[in-house]
Amino acid sequence: MEKLHQCYWKSGEPQSDDIEASRMKRAAAKHLIERYYHQLTEGCGNEACTNEFCASCPTFLRMDNNAAAIKALELYKINAKLCDPHPSKKGASSAYLENSKGAPNNSCSEIKMNKKGARIDFKDVTYLTEEKVYEILELCREREDYSPLIRVIGRVFSSAEALVQSFRKVKQHTKEELKSLQAKDEDKDEDEKEKAACSAAAMEEDSEASSSRIGDSSQGDNNLQKLGPDDVSVDIDAIRRVYTRLLSNEKIETAFLNALVYLSPNVECDLTYHNVYSRDPNYLNLFIIVMENRNLHSPEYLEMALPLFCKAMSKLPLAAQGKLIRLWSKYNADQIRRMMETFQQLITYKVISNEFNSRNLVNDDDAIVAASKCLKMVYYANVVGGEVDTNHNEEDDEEPIPESSELTLQELLGEERRNKKGPRVDPLETELGVKTLDCRKPLIPFEEFINEPLNEVLEMDKDYTFFKVETENKFSFMTCPFILNAVTKNLGLYYDNRIRMYSERRITVLYSLVQGQQLNPYLRLKVRRDHIIDDALVRLEMIAMENPADLKKQLYVEFEGEQGVDEGGVSKEFFQLVVEEIFNPDIGMFTYDESTKLFWFNPSSFETEGQFTLIGIVLGLAIYNNCILDVHFPMVVYRKLMGKKGTFRDLGDSHPVLYQSLKDLLEYEGNVEDDMMITFQISQTDLFGNPMMYDLKENGDKIPITNENRKEFVNLYSDYILNKSVEKQFKAFRRGFHMVTNESPLKYLFRPEEIELLICGSRNLDFQALEETTEYDGGYTRDSVLIREFWEIVHSFTDEQKRLFLQFTTGTDRAPVGGLGKLKMIIAKNGPDTERLPTSHTCFNVLLLPEYSSKEKLKERLLKAITYAKGFGML
């Protein structure tokens, strides 16, 4: 009813007394609403204020202008408490109210700064530009009061709409124009459009029209730079300059911090429920702007602001992540490292400030999960921005491995087969068209992305379960393998292999029940020690042809005429003997380079493809059964196994002499054709030392190598040596390897250098670490006299004797992934003083040591045992 009596009677003629009374009521109401609005947006100035509806109250949650206007109306209706202006702010408050009283309805939100007669309507700033920031900063310096700038930053950086419009690219400035951006703009237009108003009606109009007003901001589209599909509209250099100027002021930095706390939940909501990126790709700007804040890793951000921002950023759709990654890939190494360290700092802080265990999983910590997802974007930016080779893929001409004729356990139970399409591929790799394997040299080393504190608290059995189930509400760190060390990933692979073995065993039992015939639940190999290659080759070839799925069963080896039961130790010796036999230079399957101590495929080998397939199967089985092999391949072999062809740079590892010669050719400054007189025809020798000529191009003997085509010659030569000359042998080798590992997450989790570590173990033998982790049983302790003497003897061994000792106790002379400290050896007492030699259970890394009467006898018996240890018997 009140609205009916505001101005006129029904007759249309104003009654002077009522009009005056109505005007005074409206003025009083307007004045009170303005005070509430001022209190909500600027506060009373008292830092110890306890009024929950005052911006100066420490517990007050900041809000934007529109929300403050609505709240001011509500407070006016309930006659809420109003603060008295604090002495430190009394002048400013009085001026604010005074301006409000005298201002017209559409401009009551103005703040006037009259030091030099300049007037800036800071409340009309709906977005920021570099010029605007410097202008406000200059005026604040003149007044020695930075609170207006702090409020502007708080308002813009807490609003997604405002931040998206800020720091837009414009047409290219000249150097003189860039310098003038930092100077005070004396001729600034005083008639800018006003965004906020203090009256209730104006504020409500603001609320309805804010989005359209931002879209029609004074940064006209005709002044914006035209952008490509992968370009962004934000001026990153301008943002960096602004941050450099502002972050040195502690109070201004606090404004950024508080704004981020308010901004992040709203952004998360926009991305989760409103599909905002598909409607406005420029929404990505706010993530770019925030990530340029070089103080994000500081302790103040780690508690709340950065975790909230990470949660919001992790909600970006795949297309937005891809665009952000492509942008970041253009950054230099220092900028990538800064962003990487920001997320690593948050993960480490959250890990060490909580107690994680099997009941309180690190996978359930939202901040760590979100930070890991954000770190993944930085990781792929590091990959894409490095030296990338997306060509030279072995997989392009790879023959598919036939599927097993047997049904899987899932199919037997009426479910669709899982992993039918092979191992998983990261969606980001598909989006970017780049794999980690394609990166020859990242911007910063891959090792810097590993977070050791996280690896220490990660319950890998639980994480693997989440990895396989792929539920939305459970995160697996195996989807971010870059953050895991080789030991943790190896454990995940171990679980995958074991579960696959048990699955094959259950399938066998089901088949036995259904078909009524006894099938072997193991991959059983019975071999003669002196005919190991022939026996193993025949058996494995039959399995590979009849049912390749049997290769995924648990390996069980028997040596004919020996009593050893294979709990792992017999398999280790089987692998060792096979490797020794196959890599014997007399057989001629591989050539040996004395300078590098490495083997390479013999292009002239007379051996059948089946034997190369066997080597591939053996390597796959070694990984599958968690055994270490003493093989010495160059790194290019593991790259080729993972799907990449060898290139010129790989020759440096596999054929260093040839690599240096070709490198000298590329760097030669003279006339190559006249001085070297070489053609596209090369010469090689066969097994008997006879020369063989090969044309790298058609009629290669007639094509001279010149300064212009020498690069082509080097590439063709490298391709011939590493790929074409050994194509038949390597295809068979790779096929055997993939028969065992084709459904494994091996390729998803590991890089080529880590595959080498899995197969060959560590070459660094740290016996001090072995001593620290060894356990004792049967009466021995760490402080037993014989144990102390034992370690003195072992530490005095030569390197060769140490390898023999490892071979005797563990079945291999190499350290496992993670070093000898991960071996968990046990030394147990095996009776009193005796003439018997020490014995071992290589399956369980147990050394059985009698209590010898003297140190000399202990050394003599131990050396004899490790020197003449061959074969297996039953104790």
Curated annotation (Swiss-Prot):
GO biological process: androgen receptor signaling pathway; brain development; negative regulation of TORC1 signaling; ovarian follicle development; positive regulation of Golgi lumen acidification; positive regulation of phosphatidylinositol 3-kinase/protein kinase B signal transduction; positive regulation of protein ubiquitination; positive regulation of transcription by RNA polymerase II
Pathway membership: Protein modification; protein ubiquitination
EC number: 2.3.2.26
Cell compartment(s), UniProt: Cytoplasm; Nucleus
Chain positions covered by the region annotation Disordered: 175-226
Modified residues (Phosphotyrosine): 659
Coiled coil: none
Effect seen on changing residue 156 to G: May be associated with AS
UniProt-listed SUPFAM superfamilies: Hect, E3 ligase catalytic domain
Domain HECT: 776-875
Stretches for region Interaction with HCV core protein: 418-517
Effect of mutating residue 481 to L: In AS; uncertain significance
A GO MF term: transcription coactivator activity
Phenotype for residue 501 to I: May be associated with AS
InterPro entries: AZUL (IPR032353), AZUL_sf (IPR042556), E3A/B/C-like (IPR044611), HECT_dom (IPR000569), Hect_E3_ubiquitin_ligase (IPR035983), UBE3A (IPR017134)
Phosphoserine PTM sites in chain numbering: 218
Matches recorded under CDD domains: HECTc
PTM characteristics: Phosphorylation at Tyr-659 by ABL1 impairs E3 ligase activity and protects p53/TP53 from degradation in (HPV)-infected cells.
Signal peptide segment: none
Compositionally biased region (Polar residues): 213-225
Record note on what altering residue 358 to T does: May be associated with AS
GO cellular component: cytosol; glutamatergic synapse; nucleus; postsynaptic cytosol; proteasome complex; synaptic vesicle
Subunit record text: The active form is probably a homotrimer. Binds UBQLN1 and UBQLN2. Interacts with the 26S proteasome. Interacts with BPY2. Interacts with HIF1AN, MAPK6 and NEURL4; interaction with MAPK6 may be mediated by NEURL4. Interacts with the proteasomal subunit PSMD4. Interacts with ESR1 and WBP2. Interacts with BMAL1. Interacts with ARC.
Pathological condition linked to this protein in its record: Angelman syndrome: A neurodevelopmental disorder characterized by severe motor and intellectual retardation, ataxia, frequent jerky limb movements and flapping of the arms and hands, hypotonia, seizures, absence of speech, frequent smiling and episodes of paroxysmal laughter, open-mouthed expression revealing the tongue.
Note: A cysteine residue is required for ubiquitin-thioester formation.
Record protein name field: Ubiquitin-protein ligase E3A
Organism: Homo sapiens
